Amino acid sequence: MSTARTENPVLMGMSSQNGQLRGPLKPSAGPGGGGTQTQQINQLKNASTINSGSQQQAQSMSSVIKPGDDWKKTLKLPPKDLRIKTSDVTSTKGNEFEDYCLKRELLMGIFEMGWEKPSPIQEESIPIALSGRDILARAKNGTGKSGAYLIPLLERLDLKKDCIQAMVIVPTRELALQVSQICIQVSKHMGGVKVMATTGGTNLRDDIMRLDDTVHVVIATPGRILDLIKKGVAKVDHIQMIVLDEADKLLSQDFVQIMEDIIITLPKNRQILLYSATFPLSVQKFMTSHLQKPYEINLMEELTLKGVTQYYAYVTERQKVHCLNTLFSRLQINQSIIFCNSSQRVELLAKKISQLGYSCFYIHAKMRQEHRNRVFHDFRNGLCRNLVCTDLFTRGIDIQAVNVVINFDFPKLAETYLHRIGRSGRFGHLGLAINLITYDDRFNLKSIEEQLGTEIKPIPSSIDKSLYVAEYHSESGEDKP
């Protein structure tokens, strides 16, 4: 099925839910979410109530599960994911999550997330992180990095202590909410793990009040957590682990001084875990200064995901919208993300797409945080098929229903391109990346191909659906008749 369309395209009004210009809403086969979008945001906002009911649940569960019982029979497992997966996540050593001697309650949360076996980055990271050693890990986007650090982080928590014991720092507010949600879900059987998400753009007073209650894990953006530390409300003197997710961005010029200021407030015996797809010189410098004999993991024989097929279409600026319209009508889009190079172009393009009759949300950094949160959760829950955005949405955002990424504006940097196309083909699945290239972009195209060691091919007149549509494959990878 191609993208949902109306017979008489009109510009739809502003949604009362998220203030987006959009055409008719057609629920796609997006990833399921627990509860409504509003419920999810409230859950992430209220650290004092997060998992507060889990203690009773875990206690009742543990009273049922006895040594020798087949405890896996009690699990509420999600439907098995039968989509084909690439070697980015299947090329493992054959380990099982049980091999790491994890708490049974943590294993229950892992399996109920649908995580059947550890991915390569999880196999490499989990035992080392459990030993307390610093880690410098380089792995592709969408290969399970969040699980690689959240599993050992949760295993090492001591719930008898009512203090912050672990901190995860991420570069964007949306990624903080996403990681928080994963942490909450994985730890739901552990009996009272308190997770707090704190980001800029939200009420500082609310965060201060929530820190009066017990918090074990903080997921934060750099500026907000430093502010809370300086005010003396975020007590970090008992932190045993700090994780820098998307470390290359966190240690760029935008954040590096803030990160330095955060690190010096932590205990000297803290464990530092760095995860990223790219490691520029700034990361190497930080590693030399702050990591103690780190265990280095490099799973990057190539930079781009194996499951993402890349094409370019040579167009003039005036032809871009027409080309996009053609792609919408010919591609079998589950969900798509469309990138522009400025906030203004994002809004203009979203308006154009809505006028063409396609359902469309947009998101960029200049929007109010409340609207950004709503758009993120609505799109994640499959309420809209297409999302137009800036590079705000390139970092770590994991929406596995996205099978098509379109660079309406081609990026100038190879790093930006790498993170953009990594929004499709998540966790070893198949995806498509299409780049609209103008005359002025041709040198950037060649440069990015050379830097990433990849080939971006001219778009064919017809694209084989088996390259990006999961239904055309069985689990064994054989094409369906």
From Swiss-Prot:
GO biological process, one term: negative regulation of translation
Biased composition (Polar residues): 41-51
Gene Ontology cellular-component annotations: cytoplasm; nucleus; P-body; ribonucleoprotein complex
UniProt cross-references to InterPro entries, sorted A to Z: DEAD/DEAH_box_helicase_dom (IPR011545), Helicase_ATP-bd (IPR014001), Helicase_C-like (IPR001650), P-loop_NTPase (IPR027417), RNA-helicase_DEAD-box_CS (IPR000629), RNA_helicase_DEAD_Q_motif (IPR014014)
Compositional bias ranges of the Low complexity kind: 52-63
Main location: cytoplasm
Renumbered ranges of motif DEAD box: 245-248
Keywords in alphabetical order: ATP-binding, Cytoplasm, Developmental protein, Helicase, Hydrolase, Nucleotide-binding, Nucleus, Ribonucleoprotein, RNA-binding
Function recorded in the entry: ATP-dependent RNA helicase that is an integral component of messenger ribonucleoprotein complexes (mRNPs), storage particles that mask maternal mRNAs from the translational apparatus during oocyte maturation.
Subcellular location: Cytoplasm, P-body; Cytoplasm; Nucleus
Catalytic activity line of the entry: ATP + H2O = ADP + phosphate + H(+)
Taxonomic superkingdom: Eukaryota
Protein name stated in the entry: Probable ATP-dependent RNA helicase ddx6
